[in-house]
Amino acid sequence: MRHYEIVFMVHPDQSEQVPGMIERYTGAITAAAGTIHRLEDWGRRQLAYPINKLHKAHYVLLNVEAPQEAIDELETNFRFNDAVIRSMVMRTKHAVTEASPMVKAKDERRERREDFANETADDSEAGDSEE
């Protein structure tokens, strides 16, 4: 089986349907004896240029190992689902399991924010005890 990286963009008004879509698409891959190596829901993001007069879309990234029939079925599902405004399927040489740069940056920002919140909470507690 070959490895693929799949990115699809969902209409921003249909964001609440994304978890169901992810479940349906991952179910189709696993039913065809495929493996999902990475699944990232990037959320609603700004588009580089307007698509169908839209400026935002909900992004989802999948890295999978699947037979060609499963990928063909997935592409057909993308094509006939009106909520999916764009999709891209690329073949890769190896399975990618590490977090994408977008998720890494988001995690680092969250960690810095939590560290800052902990430091300010510690400082306020220390200031209260000195009085």
Curated annotation (Swiss-Prot):
Belongs to the bacterial ribosomal protein bS6 family. This is Small ribosomal subunit protein bS6. Residues 120-131 have a biased composition (Acidic residues). Binds together with bS18 to 16S ribosomal RNA. It comes from Klebsiella pneumoniae (strain 342). GO terms for cellular component: cytosolic small ribosomal subunit. The keyword RNA-binding applies. Residues 104-116 have a biased composition (Basic and acidic residues). HAMAP family: Ribosomal_bS6. GO terms for biological process: translation.
